[in-house]
Design a protein with these regions (language model features):
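GIY-YIG nuclease catalytic motif and its immediate N-terminal context
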Residues: 1-58, 86-101
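Generic structural signal for short, solvent-exposed loop/turn connectors between secondary structure elements
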Residues: 13, 20, 63-65, 109-110
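Extended aliphatic helical segments
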Residues: 14, 29, 72-73, 107
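A broadly used, surface-exposed interaction patch
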Residues: 55-78
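Canonical phosphoinositide-binding patch of PH/PH-like domains
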Residues: 81-84
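Intrinsically disordered, low-complexity regulatory tails
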Residues: 101-110
C-alpha cells in the first residue's frame, strides 16, 4: 500500500535494510513504527530529497542516519518510501521537501 503525504503519493514503505534504491531523483521519507498512525502503522521521522537514490552509500552515509537509528529500537524497524521525480530540479524537490517538513514536523528534520 502506497503512502500519501500532502497529496504526494509515495511508494509502499520498505524496511530500510531490504531497500534497493532506483537510479532516479526524488523525495524520500524515513518512517518508524507507530501503532496510532493510519492507514499504515508508520509515522514520518525525516523527509529528504536526492538527485540519485542509487548514489553510493546513500542511506548509511547520510548525516542523519544516526538520528534515525536512535529513534527506533533496531535499525531493522526503519522504513523508507519514495516519491519519484525524474527530470526534476533540486529547487523543485527542495520546495516540496520544505512543504512536507512544515506540515508533518518530523523529529529528525531540524
Amino acid at each position: 500500500m502506497n503512502m500519501t503525504f500532502d497529496n504526494y503519493e509515495f511508494s509502499e514503505p520498505v524496511k530500510i535494510t531490504k531497500w534497493e534504491p532506483p537510479e532516479s531523483r526524488g523525495l524520500y521519507v524515513i518512517l518508524e513504527p507507530d501503532l496510532y498512525s493510519s492507514p499504515l502503522p508508520l509515522k514520518p521521522i525525516y523527509f529528504g530529497q536526492t538527485g540519485n537514490f542509487a548514489e553510493r552509500g546513500f542511506i548509511k552515509s547520510h548525516e542523519k542516519y544516526k538520528d534515525w537509528t536512535r529513534e527506533v529500537v533496531k535499525k531493522e524497524h526503519l522504513f523508507i518510501a519514495i516519491y519519484l521525480m525524474p527530470g526534476s530540479t533540486e529547487e523543485e524537490r527542495k520546495a516540496i521537501e520544505t512543504e512536507l517538513i512544515a506540515k508533518y514536523q518530523p523529529v529528525c528534520n531540524d
